[in-house]
Amino acid sequence: MGTYKYQAEIDVLIQQGLKMPEVVKPNDLKGFRFVFSSDMSKSYLPNYIMKPQRAIMNGQRKVDVGGYALSCFIEKDKAIKFYHLLAKNMRNIYKTIGDSISSGIVTNNDGNITALASNGHYNLFEFPSCDLSKTFKLEEGKLWKQ
């Protein structure tokens, strides 16, 4: 499995009874990720690092170890489709998950990934040295226009 960038935080959730998902090596898998075009610094942080209160189990929402992983898709079209599906129920989606897409290659040195979901989604559990902001590039065009 390995030690991940947010291993201490993951361990807290595991101690609370949550399970780490099955993971595999990415083997140079293409990745597409939602990003904030105006603030790339927070674009490569997991959900629970950006908003730590989301990792607190209070019975109101489902907490998942994947909150300490980076969400990616294998195809740009699938990412766009998912974004627009979410946008139907999230009025300010561009503030929550971003307004654009970046892409790059996820290598075995970056971390381990979960199995691909039917919509092409996977989570990347980063190794400590991983920094996708250095290897992923912003795609042209915005998903959300304010």
Write out the residue ranges for each language-model feature:
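Intrinsically disordered, low-complexity segments enriched in small/polar residues
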Residues: 2-4, 46, 120, 125, ...
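Generic detection of intrinsically disordered/low-complexity segments and helix-coil linkers/edges
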Residues: 26-28, 38, 42, 67, ...
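ADP-ribose/NAD+-binding catalytic cleft of ART/PARP-like enzymes
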Residues: 1-64, 146
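ADP-ribosyltransferase catalytic core
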Residues: 57-129
